[in-house]
């Protein structure tokens, strides 16, 4: 066993290593190891899920969540929605969500702006996310224009290029109000017209499959910088400008809920996307339309239920608000990148999605 002195000395060496000066070529060295996105079609998670079903704790919760998602896919009258918060797209799950949309496992997406713009659209432009090789002083990262998400790096200069691309798209569109869904549809169209440096992004796939993507807090992302710059420039020129209509987002997603009838939610994280999707039931009621609570719901989160926040609130709690049925619901308290690939692969290989009719909800809005 190490003495107290030895432990302190070890800690000093670790701190010195973290604060060591970084050579001028360190940025290139730091941005070497690319995050590779998991491919749910390349492995069969069914045996793992089947084994977990016989276990306890989070393993059994995960298996039950997989079962509920498969039930939703097997229910031919059910529309399944992906609710996405957090940074799992940057962490290696980006192609999971793309493949779920491509194979008709997801009919609508509600996500944070960062998931869609800073991560998915960012990579569609040919940029990458990188694995951090070891501890580096964050001030040194800042000096080298490297942004950090836990153990993942992003080139800030490339992120600013993403911001500028949003500005260019804004400047080409008619200056009026757009829901985030309509603007993201335009982003998908722009990529599909030959501008994508990486094929098969979630945005482009959703555009091609008629799957709407909603970002209720759209400007809380790289898109926000491009939109603000667009508006400032147009105001200075005394010209009309484009804006994002958040009310239209809520109205349109509620229209999808009303048209869909039975719905199932696959929730990764929580926050604004979670509450936004759940609230469509209440909004329909306020509009005088009787809408069923979301019939199937699973949520993967590490949030602590005791803080009273939306992200951590259980699905049973949502039932008290009239949002989610408690018959088929499961909370999985786990870090999402460890669980999402298992549940999604299990669903892919059980193939309950085969034969599902793709509703292409963008058609509700003339797209």
UniProtKB/Swiss-Prot annotation:
One of its GO terms (cellular component) is cytoplasm. It holds the Pfam family DS. Its EC number is 2.5.-.-. The keyword RNA-binding does not apply. GO terms for molecular function: deoxyhypusine synthase activity. InterPro entries: Deoxyhypusine_synthase (IPR002773), Deoxyhypusine_synthase-like (IPR023496), Deoxyhypusine_synthase_sf (IPR036982), DHS-like_NAD/FAD-binding_dom (IPR029035). Residues 1-23 are annotated as: Disordered. It is an enzyme of class 2 (transferase). The keyword Thylakoid does not apply. Keywords: Transferase. Belongs to the deoxyhypusine synthase family. PANTHER family: DEOXYHYPUSINE SYNTHASE, DEOXYHYPUSINE SYNTHASE-LIKE PROTEIN. NCBIfam families: PRK02492.1 (NF002699). This is Deoxyhypusine synthase-like protein. It comes from Caulobacter vibrioides (strain ATCC 19089 / CIP 103742 / CB 15) (Caulobacter crescentus).
């Amino acid at each position: 066993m190490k003495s107290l002195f030895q432990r302190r000395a070890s800690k000093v060496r670790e701190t010195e290593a973290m604060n060591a000066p970084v050579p001028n070529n360190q940025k290139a060295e730091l941005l070497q190891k690319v995050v590779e996105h998991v491919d749910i079609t390349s492995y069969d998670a069914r045996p793992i899920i089947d084994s977990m079903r016989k276990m306890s704790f989070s393993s059994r919760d995960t298996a039950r969540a997989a079962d509920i998602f498969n039930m939703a896919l097997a229910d031919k009258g059910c529309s399944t929605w992906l609710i996405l918060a957090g940074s799992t797209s940057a962490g290696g799950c980006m192609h999971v969500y793309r493949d779920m949309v491509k194979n008709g496992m997801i009919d609508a997406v509600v996500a944070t702006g960062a998931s869609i713009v800073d991560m998915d659209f960012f990579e569609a432009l040919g940029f990458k996310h990188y694995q951090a090789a070891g501890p580096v002083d964050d001030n040194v990262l800042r000096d080298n224009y490297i942004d950090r998400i836990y153990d993942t790096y992003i080139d800030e200069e490339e992120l600013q290029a993403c911001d500028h691309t949003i500005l260019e798209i804004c400047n080409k569109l008619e200056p009026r109000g757009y829901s985030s869904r309509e603007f993201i549809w335009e982003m998908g169209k722009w990529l599909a017209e030959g501008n994508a440096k990486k094929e098969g992004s979630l945005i482009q796939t959703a555009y091609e499959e008629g799957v709407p993507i909603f970002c209720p807090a759209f400007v809380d992302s790289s898109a926000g910088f491009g939109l603000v710059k667009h508006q400032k420039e147009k105001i200075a020129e005394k010209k009309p400008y484009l804006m994002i209509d958040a009310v239209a987002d809520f109205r349109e997603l509620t229209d999808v809920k009303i048209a869909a009838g039975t719905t199932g939610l696959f929730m990764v994280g929580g926050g604004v996307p979670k509450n936004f999707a759940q609230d469509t039931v209440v909004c329909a009621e306020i509009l005088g339309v009787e809408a069923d609570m979301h019939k199937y719901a699973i949520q993967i989160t590490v949030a602590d239920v005791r803080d009273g926040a939306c992200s951590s609130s259980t699905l049973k709690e949502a039932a008290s608000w009239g949002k989610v049925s408690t018959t088929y619901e499961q909370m999985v308290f786990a870090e999402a990148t460890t669980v999402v690939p298992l549940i999604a692969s299990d669903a892919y290989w059980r193939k309950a999605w085969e034969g599902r009719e793709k509703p292409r909800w963008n058609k509700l809005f003339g797209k």
